[in-house]
Amino acid sequence: MADWDAAQYLKFADERTRPAADLLARVPLAAPARVVDLGCGPGNSTELLVARYPEAAILGLDTSPGMLAEARRRLPGVAFEQADVASLNPEPPPDLLFANAVLQWLPHHASLLPRLARSLAPGGCLAVQMPDNLEEPSHRLMRRVAGEPPFAARLAAAAASRTRIASFSEYDAWLTAAGCTVDIWRTTYVHALAGHRGIVEWVRGTGLRPFLDPLDAEAQAEFLARYEAALAEAYPPQADGRVLLPFPRLFLVARRTR
């Protein structure tokens, strides 16, 4: 995919940061020495970590040069590096791995999450938040439009870019076997957006990227027009024109006990 657009992502900065704050509130660590923000994006989650743990050595990691540039602008005193979470082997072992809205882009959760948990220092935490919205109309309709002509051939792989979120029992079993106690929950946020175009603008910064990046400008415009029309059928507006977008997210905090 093309590089992430930090400005597009930050159009909804407050809404995207709230789940990170909710995740951090459940982390049971008073004074971790080493904290790594996995998929730090433009630094909005890193900023929360700096505020809570001002004495910690904090490192933000992301694959996107654009996101890292924005993170460095926001937090010039924090270390940021370009790195792939999928192959991460942190040394020395961190006390907190914080993964807000990143692991849904990576496959093989049955092996990935236990590997990350085992990389922690004793007593350390893996804190994860992932959008769990693949079966919401906002995402089902992306796949439906992508399967129509003239998009189907060019977008055949787009739907596979996101990983299926597993069940509570699967994550609990995988992380318990890795020597952790597990706190897991699901929250549905309801975002009031400015019409159906508001939903389009929201997902353009994240979920729509695999569907738009393979298309030229003309095809993108046609895709977005069809997608917005489909959204208008799925999300009835409020009396004042706002549209309510339910957005479920899965959270877990795994603490290494052995």
Curated annotation (Swiss-Prot):
One of its GO terms (cellular component) is cytoplasm. The lineage of its organism: Bacteria, Pseudomonadati, Pseudomonadota, Alphaproteobacteria, Hyphomicrobiales. One of its GO terms (molecular function) is trans-aconitate 2-methyltransferase activity. It catalyses: trans-aconitate + S-adenosyl-L-methionine = (E)-3-(methoxycarbonyl)pent-2-enedioate + S-adenosyl-L-homocysteine. Catalyzes the S-adenosylmethionine monomethyl esterification of trans-aconitate. It comes from the Bacteria. Keywords: Cytoplasm, Methyltransferase, S-adenosyl-L-methionine, Transferase. This is Trans-aconitate 2-methyltransferase. HAMAP family: Tran_acon_Me_trans. GO terms for biological process: methylation. Its main location: cytoplasm. InterPro entries: Methyltransf_25 (IPR041698), SAM-dependent_MTases_sf (IPR029063), Trans-aconitate_MeTrfase (IPR023506), Trans_acon_MeTrfase_C (IPR023149). Belongs to the methyltransferase superfamily. Tam family. Gene3D superfamilies: S-adenosyl-L-methionine-dependent methyltransferases, Vaccinia Virus protein VP39. It is an enzyme of class 2 (transferase). It holds the Pfam family Methyltransf_25. It is found in: Cytoplasm. The keyword Transferase applies. The keyword Cell inner membrane does not apply. Its EC number is 2.1.1.144. The gene is tam.
